[in-house]
């Protein structure tokens, strides 16, 4: 299969418990200062939360966040482009919400090899061969934010250069996006469009919303270092990038404890397709060689635990209280788990 399914739960170093469940968020409130017309279409800076209203997509984290006036108000787990069709990086903007979109297959080898659709031959809205689902949101060629994905595709490679969501996720996202863009879009409106799957409807936002596409495999979140898998094999999990990230918070590697440094460097290697970076062992001092041996042992132990995992979390004391915000009101795309059926024993205890 071309799809690589990654585990939902991260591995956490330095603590026996997993990440705390984030508190539920609140719907955005209209705000004149949130108008993107007053916001320059420029990156907010590596590793940082934006000070304005925009969408942040970080491909290695399989995550999309909505910020309003610098506050994170909503998060989504997403599917990303396959390695041969990667999600690009850079600044885009969203100015339309298109309900029940048609799809014109592009002139690509994966379309030409298909026996179901032909290049340039329009596929109708609502057709089972249309992969875009109930909504598409253009963010600049060749990328879209669109629905149509099964829950199993969320958190995986799932598209040809787009942000992929389930239909329920993209409907939720469209309502928040519309409100930020100055357009009223009610639950009833969304339901009406879903009922009329053959009818394409374009909703134009009064204010286009900036969309920042990132490729950051290193992040500080909630006082912890998150090391994401280098999904597009861009050699980003290296010491030089770690030092740049720490420098954002006024730290250096020397500010970490020996155990923290060992765990961190092991995590970088374990989450890299091509571990390493600039490392000439012949020029290392004896002390550096000893440290490298510790890192290699930790990496080997960690790698055995990480098959299929998408991130490692390392607790670093000096980062306490710092970093990008944790997900808010996260929609994972997964169906809710049914409540456990009480056993006879628990029913007896309940009496």
Task: Enumerate the predicted regions with their spans.
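N-terminal pre-domains immediately preceding structured catalytic cores
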Residues: 1-163, 167-351
């Amino acid at each position: 299969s071309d799809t690589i399914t990654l585990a939902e739960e991260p591995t956490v170093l330095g603590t026996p418990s997993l990440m705390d469940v984030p508190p539920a968020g609140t719907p955005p409130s209209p705000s004149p200062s949130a108008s993107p017309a007053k916001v320059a279409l420029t990156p907010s800076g590596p590793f940082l939360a934006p000070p304005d209203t925009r969408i942040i997509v970080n491909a290695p984290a399989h995550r999309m966040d909505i910020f309003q006036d610098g506050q994170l108000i909503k998060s989504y787990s997403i599917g990303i482009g396959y390695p041969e069709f990667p999600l690009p990086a850079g600044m885009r903007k969203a100015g339309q919400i298109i309900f029940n979109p048609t799809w014109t297959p592009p002139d690509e080898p994966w379309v030409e090899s298909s026996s179901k659709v032909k290049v340039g031959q329009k596929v109708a809205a609502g057709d089972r061969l249309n992969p875009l689902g109930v909504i598409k949101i253009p963010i600049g060629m060749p990328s879209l934010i669109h629905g149509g994905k099964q829950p199993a595709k969320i958190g995986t490679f799932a598209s040809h250069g787009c942000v992929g969501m389930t239909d329920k996720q993209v409907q939720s996202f469209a309502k928040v996006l519309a409100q930020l863009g100055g357009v009223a879009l009610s639950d009833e409106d969304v339901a009406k469009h879903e009922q009329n799957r053959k009818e394409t409807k374009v909703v134009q936002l009064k204010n286009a919303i900036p969309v920042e596409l990132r490729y950051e495999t290193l992040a500080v979140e909630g006082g912890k270092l998150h090391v994401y898998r280098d999904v597009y094999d861009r050699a980003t999990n290296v010491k030089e990038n770690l030092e740049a990230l720490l420098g954002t918070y006024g730290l250096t590697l020397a500010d970490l404890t020996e155990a923290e440094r060992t765990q961190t460097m092991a995590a970088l290697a374990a989450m890299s397709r091509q571990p390493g970076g600039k490392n000439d062992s012949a020029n290392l001092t004896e002390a550096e060689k000893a440290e490298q041996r510790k890192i290699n042992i930790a990496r080997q132990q960690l790698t055995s635990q990480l098959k299929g995992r998408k991130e490692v979390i390392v607790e670093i004391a000096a980062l306490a209280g710092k970093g990008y915000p944790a997900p808010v009101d996260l929609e994972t795309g997964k169906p809710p788990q049914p409540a456990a059926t009480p056993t006879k024993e628990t029913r007896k205890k309940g009496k």
